């Protein structure tokens, strides 16, 4: 009895695993079938755009166009009606006749042109952004070049005043030598001017002879 007891619960385990795999396969297969075809809204817009009727396309004409494209109309009748209502609410389709899904529908030209314009604007904005990025690159080059120029100029300016100071110092001893040379010859010139002043008493001798002439006249 001890040998047969553990064998009984091991048998139902594989039976439980099999239905889980089947369910997973069914879900994957259903998802693939739904994703394979385009959505109903796209098929409706294409059918309405292809029609040349001015008053719009009726629901019956839409179903015929969808059936010709290979869409199962009988199974997806409710989806067609919901797709028409959503397209009218968005503004892609305009309902010219009737109410709800039972009526005639036409493409909204304003909505179609409005969808095309934003795409063109986005493309233009992307083109405008590219030259702005290219213009930033030369700015970086100029920023790096400016400090190099400043470092080169500063030592040159410092050297010039040093050279000018050296030139001034060299000129100043020349002036001192010139002043010393000029002052030395002035002293003999003053001595020469003093000597003629001592000869003035010689001129006083002829003045003393004047009274002699007057004495002769009295005789």
From Swiss-Prot:
The chain residues annotated with the modification N6-methyllysine are 26
Q: Which InterPro entries match?
A: H1/H5 (IPR005819), Histone_H1/H5_H15 (IPR005818), WH-like_DNA-bd_sf (IPR036388), WH_DNA-bd_sf (IPR036390)
> What subcellular locations does the record give?
Nucleus; Chromosome
H15 domain ranges (all copies): 36-109
Q: What is this protein called?
A: Histone H1.4
The protein's organism comes out as Rattus norvegicus
Taxonomic classification, please? Eukaryota, Metazoa, Chordata, Craniata, Vertebrata
Gene3D superfamilies associated with the record: Winged helix-like DNA-binding domain superfamily/Winged helix DNA-binding domain (1.10.10.10)
Molecular functions per Gene Ontology:
ADP binding; AMP binding; ATP binding; calcium ion binding; chromatin DNA binding; dATP binding; DNA binding; double-stranded DNA binding
Annotated region (Disordered) at 1-41, 92-219
Entry keyword Acyltransferase:
no
One Gene Ontology CC term in the entry: nucleosome
Which SUPFAM superfamilies does the UniProt entry name for this protein?
Winged helix' DNA-binding domain (SSF46785)
Q: How is it modified after translation?
A: H1 histones are progressively phosphorylated during the cell cycle, becoming maximally phosphorylated during late G2 phase and M phase, and being dephosphorylated sharply thereafter. Acetylated at Lys-26. Deacetylated at Lys-26 by SIRT1.
Q: Which SMART domains does its entry note?
A: H15
**What is written about domains in the entry's comments?**
The C-terminal domain is required for high-affinity binding to chromatin.
Q: Which residues carry this modification: N6-acetyllysine?
A: 17, 26
S-S bonds: none
What residues bear ADP-ribosylserine in this entry? 150
């Amino acid at each position: 009895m001890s040998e047969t007891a553990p064998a009984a619960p091991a048998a139902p385990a594989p039976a439980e695993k099999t239905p889980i795999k089947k369910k997973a396969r069914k879900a994957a297969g259903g998802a693939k079938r739904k994703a394979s075809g385009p959505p109903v809204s796209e098929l409706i817009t294409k059918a309405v755009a292809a029609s040349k009727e001015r008053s719009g396309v009726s629901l019956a004409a839409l179903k015929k166009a969808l059936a010709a494209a290979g869409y199962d109309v009988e199974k997806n009748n409710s989806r067609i009606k919901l797709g028409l209502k959503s397209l009218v609410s968005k503004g892609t389709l305009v309902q010219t006749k009737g109410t709800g899904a039972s009526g005639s529908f036409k493409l909204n030209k304003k909505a179609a042109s409005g969808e095309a314009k934003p795409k063109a604007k986005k493309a233009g904005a992307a083109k405008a952004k590219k030259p702005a990025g290219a213009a930033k690159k030369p700015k970086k080059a100029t920023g790096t070049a400016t400090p190099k120029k400043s470092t080169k100029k500063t030592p040159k300016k410092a050297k010039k005043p040093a050279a000018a100071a050296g030139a001034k110092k060299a000129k100043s001893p020349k002036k001192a030598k010139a002043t010393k040379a000029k002052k030395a010859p002035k002293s003999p010139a003053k001595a020469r001017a003093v000597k003629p002043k001592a000869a003035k008493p010689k001129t006083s001798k002829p003045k003393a002879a004047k009274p002699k002439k007057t004495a002769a006249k009295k005789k």
